[in-house]
Amino acid sequence: MKYGKIRIEDGFLVFTRHMMINNLPCKDIVWAYMRKEGTDEGDDRQLSVNYLVIVTRRKKRYKFDMTEKEIHECIRILKILNPDMATGFPKGGRISLQSLPNTRDLGAIVTADDRHILPRRLLRSGELYHISESDKNRLREEYNLKTVIDLRSAEERKCKPDTIMAEVEYYHVPVVDEDVQVISNREQFVKMLAGLPDDIEEYMIRQYRNLCMDQLVLKQYARFIDILFRQEKGAVLWHCGTGKDRTGIGTAFLLSLLGVEEDVIYEDYLRTNRYMEPKLVYMQRLVQTWPEADEKMTEKLPIIYNVKEEYLAAVFETVKKTYGSMEKFFQTVFYLKPKMIEEFRNKYLI
């Protein structure tokens, strides 16, 4: 099968480089994606060119220009020949699932040393209680989901248990196991809103700061990282309730451990606001119809579905003040020496 200047024959990607024919085993390709260069907009009109980018186990990159149709077909065939190959360039974006609004692939997020997280390996999410059959199938088949880490409390899991998927291993790593209020009906929801303080931002900053000073909480995040460290194949998905606070802090620790710069970590953290906006708007309209709910309750709703940069900043500031740096934090709390950190990075970066 020929695609532009390359062809696939007998499990090999065949192409010419420097007047020599190369036979690259398809099994050696770890990542394939489409990249578009140039623009056809504005006064400086340039030809827009599509490229198939191939990354190998030896971290070599090859780029081939071809049509968009050829690229998609080529990636499809490569995926059949090598099911473990990562595809796409999500850059931390949302996975377009029907039933899960805040499930994201951290793949293609760039690190400070210009490496990328491999796509379809690290997935952050909200709860899986209402996951649809089609979404389950997609996570298993397209993302090769092998492990789910539930960061919720035992009571939360009892109220809204994860939907069990075949051939997926489940871990319960409760970051906070007692203080999380479980909401299962309208009366409890109203009571929860009424109980939130008026200085809600300061309250959340204190909550975040307290979380990263609690040794039991940090022990659970260390366990979360340990599970990722031991993962051999397939994708890992971790989640809490809405996928913003406990998941957000854990993801920030993970991205920092992988060498991602803080401004990029904040970008990932704040994406929750975009993906949870429809749910927030719906709940604001709904609560306004409840006679027992007042205006203050409606104003407090964003705290359930939104995050702010100041919350995560409190985590980084507290950790650095307590341990001196993120590196010392990882060594002291997660027991990860520099050699182990590099081993962890080599597992998930390319």
State what each model feature region is.
Residues 3, 9, 31, 41-237, ...:
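Cys-dependent protein tyrosine phosphatase-like superfamily
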Residues 5, 9-39:
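Phosphoinositide-binding peripheral membrane targeting modules
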